[in-house]
A protein has these predicted regions:
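Hydrophobic core of alpha-helical transmembrane segments in multi-pass integral membrane proteins
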Residues: 1-13
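12-transmembrane solute porter fold
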Residues: 7, 20-190, 202-228
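Interfacial non-cytosolic loop connecting adjacent transmembrane helices
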Residues: 193-198
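Short, charged juxtamembrane terminal tails flanking transmembrane helices
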Residues: 229-233
Length: 233
């Protein structure tokens, strides 16, 4: 993960001097709204993308639920996001996206912090509550943040801005899973989850969710740091 971040920074500086860059780095170095909105997106995906992976393991190996029941529980978050995102997108047309997206990131932080207390005895209802908080947080963050990114560039750079959103999403997902696999390998190694190492798995999950909540908190400040969004026509 650290090597990937280092190489990513080197890549950005190389692109800055390249004759035909893959990424228009002037948008990152000169456009505050564009840069911090993308940073917030990267942090958000890095902090949240491993949730489904971790909770699916928890529900099946700790709660002993089947794949179908586990999937239906986890589905709470994306369904809420899908239902609310169109509303929050329109909301960000009337309220500054910085405020809406930052509130969403704060809710994601809260949801992750709730999950950091995961125990074998944690009720499914409490888990659903955390997923509801996360679902609302995702909805408040995602559409307004994308709105801020797309609105911060001129028409000629809309394709670049859209590609950057996708890049931040995929990079964040890879980082999130990389961190999760690293921590799990430290706590339980290559062993399958079984009664003898369930407590180690729970400990690893708590460490991960607490770390992700701290990362998400940094994302709140990154989101606020974008400043007022001056939409470019």
């Amino acid at each position: 993960v650290a090597a990937g971040m280092f190489l990513g920074i080197l890549f950005l500086f190389y692109e800055k001097t390249a004759r035909s860059p893959l990424i228009e780095t002037s948008l990152l170095f000169r456009n505050r709204t564009f840069a911090f909105s993308n940073l917030a997106a990267l942090i958000n995906y890095s902090a949240t993308s491993a949730i489904v992976f971790l909770l699916s393991l928890y529900l099946q190996y700790i709660k002993h639920l089947g794949p179908r029941e586990s999937g239906l529980i986890i589905l709470t978050q994306p369904v809420l996001m899908a239902l609310l995102s169109p509303i929050t997108g329109r909301l960000s047309d009337h309220i500054e996206p910085r405020i809406v997206a930052s509130a969403g990131m704060a809710l994601c932080t809260t949801g992750l912090f709730i999950l950091s207390g995961l125990q074998a005895e944690t009720s499914v209802e409490w888990l659903l509550f955390a997923l509801v908080v996360l679902g609302i947080g995702f909805a408040l963050f995602s559409s307004p943040n994308t709105n801020a990114i797309m609105g911060s560039v001129s028409r000629e750079y809309l394709g670049v801005a859209s590609a950057m959103v996708g890049t931040m999403r995929l990079t964040g997902q890879m980082m999130s899973m990389g961190i999760a696999m690293l921590v799990l390998s430290v706590f339980i190694g290559k062993n399958p989850i079984n009664p003898s190492n369930q407590e180690a798995f729970l400990h690893a999950s708590r460490v991960l969710f607490l770390s992700f909540s701290a990362l998400s908190l940094l994302g709140v400040f990154a989101s606020l740091a974008r400043g007022r969004n001056n939409t470019i026509k």
